[in-house]
């Protein structure tokens, strides 16, 4: 009876497991899984379609073909369940057991598992300490291996060829045992004493680095075997498991042919070869034949496990490689990525989208037919409830006939039932949002215009998918978390995502502009109603300046009530009418200006902060409706006459032509080199283009009009094109410049700039040549888009993979660490203010008033807009805030360190998957940036080179600590510091701006000088880098020999010659010398550096043009040589995306700069061929030296004092060096700034937090330096949380903890080295990850999101985190309860011996509360 009852139990998958372990199966284990041995290669009988007995599809082994029916048909139906038919041997049960029952094949000869042999590093090789080549020779029967040397001088593990073996046999007879094939290897593996080996190796971790490394590797593998209890000999198979037949199906096609899984072919080969080998062994066939068969069997097993890993892949009849077991799980179309991480789902549909301007923000229009199909089950159940249909079949009929009652039910079912809309590619979480469906006629989904920005959707044929959340929980989550009206901010930056665009912006902008002397100017109105009547009557026009009495509502801080205040406001008609839609609590001043796109965005942001979510959504909807209406009423049009070509254009072009001619002249007379000429020409044209566009915009911007007094005045233009660009609705100054200015410089396909620009614009029209030049850019744009979209997607995938397990797991980790934030100032401009950087972060320590030292903000408080206003008022210029990097939570992050949830506006909630959000925020713009290249049409967007710096504000000049300069003969101050900066301070001594000044620049200000804004502080030649002398003297050339170190360049045009330093590789002699200049004084003695006995030596690097003659007198600050700077390539995100990937992969840049390893004094040691020896001596006299290639530019000179981590050889910094020398905080700052630079160039806002989260994940592993009394090996990489836990335990036991140093891993490396093998295997290199995990017998704790998705549990984030925590708490309680009951029972039995069951009180209550 019990078994019958089991039938009705719903089969529930047991998801209450908390970890998964992977290991290697022993032969006993494989046999215990198996339901029988597969002896024959036959599959199914092609006539009867019944499986052959003992074959690959045998029903006796694997289970019946039809539910509850044996093969011969003797037993049918449920009553016989569990009976085994005596005729055909088949158990009567469900067919689905054919998906889970395995078989096995007993191999006649052992076979090595190819993964452990060939997946590098070869595990077999490590365990046996043999080379892969040797093991392969043994396994594939090319050589013998000695398994037992006996009394002979042969070595165990020794390899010998066939001939050697024969000779040794003759010599020693049967004294020794040597074997071939997997048997030999198996014997060796069985003979290994793991404990002994480990002890030997532990004692042997000394000696040369190579040896230590090798031993450590072996040690690791052996310890893994020991820990996991796996025996090494299991790497060689005696029994091969056979996959259940329904997982490798064989389907009859019509026409008597079969479609089969490749695995069946591979299994057939193994079985065939195995039975043949068995027969040969029984017949005692000659050794050589049996050997060949064993080799073939080994190859067949290899192919089954991983086809193509060794030798040529086995092919089927159609010459294509067969898909082996390994291929089934790896790659994009393998099990992990195809079926476990990306499933297709039921209850979904897709259709084209069109605009739904009448919808509210939380609604979408759903076509009736789609809704009918999607909500079918709901309709069926309702039909049954109402008694209209009795069965599902009847209900189906009813729905298909489409009676009116069905449509009524559909309306009812759909009410309050949100659906989710998704637009591919889903680049961030706003790519899926929930809406309430509104039934519409037609076949297209209607989408609210305001959510288009978040979906990145437009209506040119985009399609979207609809998904129905079925369960009540799913509906609730969709409604509370995913509803479009709850997602009004971008999670990347905290900016509003529901900002109107295009026509709406144009309508609002047009309506809020003001006009001089408009009709009705100066009238005063009582209220907006009166304004509306006057406008309708034609008494005033929309742009007229008027005064209106308006009532504003402000929130009373004490009571929280809104109090009205009425006043007369000067405004325009359009703005006054727009004021009616303002939510309470938003002052009118917010819309009393021309509403451009930025202003509207700010308006929505302010509304969100001041009035809350609900009001803002309503307000945004109203703005949208009004914008559409106003844009329609405005009657915009664009005519060719709106593109005004400036009359000054011809004059500017003529001037540029003249300048170019002059440069050509200078080139001809040899004053400039070819490279300089090109650079200067490109610069002239770049400037000319900018000038044209400036005068064009100036002309478009204003128009003349007469005011009330009849005077002619300028006012902002109402030109349609100008208004579109100015409002931010469509187009930009760059595009208008191409329409009405000049197209300007174009780039060649390789990115270099063509020096003749296109002087025409689109209004004038291009000639054939100009058109041809511009096709380069357009095509490059299209090609780039295609390539880079893929790259960007891959970057996002790697980012998500490295951060997917980072979730907010606790409120506060209690750390006091943090990082100090200041405003970012570059080139004198504040790029990012302090406010933008610290908004929404928590303070790490108290913020004090700079003057009174009063506490403004306590530690651990989140900084919001209001607090920051107070800080700004107090003049605070730096704040120490908590960051994701300094958070001390073990698994995950704490809410305090993360700060504000940018997508919601409050402190982040527990369970928020901040890792994935960070990855999406960085990856999403990547794709957009990549698609942005060709909009400019390849017009070369070359950054105009700066050649001066000017003060932006008034103040006092100061210089930074490293600034040094000399005064030259003209009395100018010449900078000779590599990292000099000019600082301007205000009257309180607070730094206002800071400018980098390059080496060789001329300073035009002195220290402590008062300057006004606009003063030029320094200037320099941007196209060359000078080499300057600091001291006076007479030039004495050394090693400057023509043909050896310098070449005379004679210009073919001018006949003039200059000396150019040439590359040492091209010099004739072997002795390498560095061309340099020494200075001698009047007496011929060498000039020394003051305070030392080093003589002044100035070296020239390759490519320098020497400007002085031997014996010439020079003064300080004079230029000895110039190095031309190569022409810049156009800056495009092309440089950007790879740059971001390079930073996150932590690659060492090529030609990287060198940082000083220690603090000390620089000197140059003995040179070698092609290299300079650079030495730094620290105060204790410790010397660090390094050889630097001569072509590198050394930034330091003899006797200079450098600090640890300072750049001493020019080039990009290596993040690994920064981490090693300057620490985590500097590294984080470097990566954040570099990544932000790339995005900022494209005008993309991303919060620093997201980048920090990624950096935290890149730093999550550490290298053990001194293992102490832990079980680690020095040099081993461990998860940071793991070593912290171990150390805590060691310290509590009074043992010596391990010491470790930080290590920076690239994102790919970090994803692969995660503790979760499931996540790593599904990312990349599946084989390697699984092999390693199997040997170590790894446990996956299922901490990350990916692992849980793969095993089909709720993810431990969001509501899932709460679910898992509650479940664990309940389990712990249940355990405690069970124990208590057991104890109580035991006590009861002991005391009374009565048989009454003890009552347990409150048990139900307790377990309920845990939920």
From Swiss-Prot:
One of its GO terms (cellular component) is DNA-directed RNA polymerase complex. Pfam families: RNA_pol_Rpb1_1, RNA_pol_Rpb1_2, RNA_pol_Rpb1_3, RNA_pol_Rpb1_4, RNA_pol_Rpb1_5. InterPro entries: DNA-dir_RpoC_beta_prime, DNA-dir_RpoC_beta_prime_bact, RNA_pol_asu, RNA_pol_N, RNA_pol_Rpb1_1, RNA_pol_Rpb1_3, RNA_pol_Rpb1_3_sf, RNA_pol_Rpb1_4. It catalyses: RNA(n) + a ribonucleoside 5'-triphosphate = RNA(n+1) + diphosphate. Its cofactor is Mg(2+); Zn(2+). Zn(2+) 2 binds at residues 813, 887, 894, 897. GO terms for biological process: DNA-templated transcription. Its EC number is 2.7.7.6. It comes from the Bacteria. GO terms for molecular function: DNA binding; DNA-directed RNA polymerase activity; magnesium ion binding; zinc ion binding. DNA-dependent RNA polymerase catalyzes the transcription of DNA into RNA using the four ribonucleoside triphosphates as substrates. Belongs to the RNA polymerase beta' chain family. This is DNA-directed RNA polymerase subunit beta'. It comes from Paracidovorax citrulli (strain AAC00-1).
